[in-house]
Amino acid sequence: MAEIRQRRVLMVPAPFQGHLPSMMNLASYLSSQGFSITIVRNEFNFKDISHNFPGIKFFTIKDGLSESDVKSLGLLEFVLELNSVCEPLLKEFLTNHDDVVDFIIYDEFVYFPRRVAEDMNLPKMVFSPSSAATSISRCVLMENQSNGLLPPQDARSQLEETVPEFHPFRFKDLPFTAYGSMERLMILYENVSNRASSSGIIHNSSDCLENSFITTAQEKWGVPVYPVGPLHMTNSAMSCPSLFEEERNCLEWLEKQETSSVIYISMGSLAMTQDIEAVEMAMGFVQSNQPFLWVIRPGSINGQESLDFLPEQFNQTVTDGRGFVVKWAPQKEVLRHRAVGGFWNHGGWNSCLESISSGVPMICRPYSGDQRVNTRLMSHVWQTAYEIEGELERGAVEMAVRRLIVDQEGQEMRMRATILKEEVEASVTTEGSSHNSLNNLVHAIMMQIDEQ
């Protein structure tokens, strides 16, 4: 009897800390369902994670790009360059690869596999590690830009106005970038939003969180949308090592703190902070009289490697044990810890999902792109976060922390966060909406492969 060949799926994640883990969680799930999975990784930002994912094959594209290219080009220009460089390399790999590839799944920001799949007549789906609201907001931004309806970036009062037919988002909440020009951003978003030729869109989100946006996405692109998240909560999810080394001693420090007393601060893997803002944040945390755990990546504050510029009073607070500073933390474990009462972050979607799934309310300080969209969702739709806007001042930082950790308002927000956590937990259990969406996704991929 002839051996039945496994269905082979090629998956292409974006080489960034905020993108890789969710794609690898999806890969683990598909592998558990009997698919043969090959991950195509970039040489840029490479870290060998193969030992964490037995049964999954890995191939590295020699893109010749480095961290210095990000610094010299800027993030936006780097992403455009990455897609340009990697398209012929992927085509060469597929042409010379011994194993036949049946299906391609690619991250929305590394869209070069879409063109390769079309040239080689391979079925494909796009994976979005972003919120569905962000996907829609990119289109809203492009439409308003094309129609000349975007307010100038210095027209503050107009930027505060609600975008027509996109309540509750203001113009200032749309996913502008701090990393390049509007013209180049439109080129990126046009490619990222080119999804109608895909056989489906996979979102790391949940129907219980974004039902209306998921429905809108399905209507807009005319293809099935699979809200399968939060993927880090699926039963088959395996731990994807961080691209940064985690300092686990912070968990021992948390054990010494009172329940729901700690404000955890992490601005993600890409966001940068000015030293003036960092000083105001530091003093605000000191003046709040709450214990704090602060993740400060080397170089993330105005490119500085040393923290010598932070005030002596802050350093003394850390020395005395009320504060703890690390270069990177095991974030999911931190957020699940009983001592953590709030999460100060940039509004990145991974941080939002991890906070929601842990029942932890947030203070959001968005910087660029989807962070503004997510922050508006958290603060005005789900009401589980505060947004801290304008110029940072230590008094405002102190007040925000105390509102969240100490005041009645924060307790009510924590209750809403707990309810949202329970809804998300239910969505990933058997018969939950995300679990069913994963099953539908598996069936759809099998059908597409078998029909070839």
Curated annotation (Swiss-Prot):
Keyword Metal-binding: no
One Pfam family it belongs to: UDPGT
Gene3D superfamilies (alphabetical): Glycogen Phosphorylase B
Transmembrane segments: none
Family annotation (InterPro entries): UDP_glucos_trans
Sorted UniProt keywords: Glycosyltransferase, Transferase
Residues annotated to bind UDP-alpha-D-glucose: 269, 329-331, 346-354, 368-371
GO molecular function, one term: quercetin 7-O-glucosyltransferase activity
EC number of the protein: 2.4.1.-
Role summary: Possesses low quercetin 7-O-glucosyltransferase activity in vitro.
Family: Belongs to the UDP-glycosyltransferase family.
Name of protein: UDP-glycosyltransferase 76D1
